[in-house]
């Protein structure tokens, strides 16, 4: 079995969304290993020395296997290619990204991919997405991975879930890419950046 991963954003000595990472880590462990003592990530990491944007990568199975702190730079993205895969599964954040990597390799001249499953928009290779019609941001109701930043934005009402098919893309003006490391609003592209 592959290891599971939590990726935590650290900047100015502060770790973000620890409660949501704790929830996902412990619900993953409960699902795969049964009822075991919960782990509190907050007691296991020390963000204080890291002033610049840093990725804290926690690998785990039943227990924590490793904790790494890695300087992080956001990869520039200005174009997306739609790719279809009706069998892809990535409900749990694991080290096994074989299918996603294969799809990413098919991006051709584009910076990233936007994955379509059963005619519904899901995620890019590393980000959840949201679409803006100029008034509201809509997030695909069936992402490949329910990311912690996505959950945070849903709880705050910043984004709302919606069924978004490939035919719906043209109804929107912008797409935002975000994840635990990339804040909402840091990557916003015109809808024309998607190769349909």
PLM ranges: what are they?
Residues 129-130, 145:
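A short acidic/small-residue loop/turn micro-motif
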């Amino acid at each position: 079995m592959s290891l599971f991963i939590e990726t935590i954003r650290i900047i100015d000595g502060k770790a973000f969304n620890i409660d949501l990472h704790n929830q996902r880590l412990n619900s993953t462990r409960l699902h795969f290993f049964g009822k075991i003592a919960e782990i509190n990530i907050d007691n296991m990491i020390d963000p204080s020395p890291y002033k610049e944007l840093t990725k804290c990568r926690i690998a785990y199975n039943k227990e924590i296997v490793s904790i790494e702190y890695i300087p992080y730079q956001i990869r520039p993205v200005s174009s997306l290619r739609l790719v279809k895969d009706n069998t892809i599964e990535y409900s749990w954040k694991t080290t096994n990204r074989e299918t996603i990597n294969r799809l990413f390799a098919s991006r051709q001249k584009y910076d990233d991919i936007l994955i379509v499953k059963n005619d519904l928009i899901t995620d890019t290779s590393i980000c959840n997405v949201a679409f803006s019609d100029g008034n509201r941001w809509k997030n695909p109701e069936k992402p490949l991975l329910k990311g912690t930043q996505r959950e945070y934005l849903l709880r705050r009402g910043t984004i709302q879930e919606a069924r978004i098919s490939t035919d719906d893309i043209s109804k929107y003006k912008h797409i935002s890419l975000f994840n635990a490391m990339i804040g909402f609003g840091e990557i916003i592209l015109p809808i024309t950046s998607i190769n349909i």
